[in-house]
Amino acid sequence: MAGFHIANGIFYIHVAFCFKKRRIPLASIRRISIDFMRGRKGGGARYFVIIEQKDGTTTMFFMGKSKTNDALLEQLPQAVQRYPIKINKMY
């Protein structure tokens, strides 16, 4: 299952370890930062996604590295191009 999806102008988060709102309107997002963490001792590689909103709050979550998540992150700039959202890939 994918870590997130975008539909009807809303960013939906499907990850278990996200302790804030899981539905974020795209109009309220200022920046999405994506970082990559190597897996150590059998933990597996992960993507670390930080969503910064215009009101100053941030939401972060982890996604595992897989082919589906790689494709999802490659399509992210095209999915949010109608909104003034900066996407920072730090890997």
Regions from the PLM with identified roles:
Residues 1-6, 57-59, 66, 82:
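Anionic N-terminal interaction surfaces
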Residues 9:
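Nucleic-acid endo/exonuclease domains
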Residues 67-91:
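Cytosol-/stroma-facing membrane-proximal "stalk/adaptor" domains immediately downstream
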Residues 12-69, 90-91:
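Non-transmembrane, membrane-adjacent beta-strand/coil modules in membrane-associated proteins
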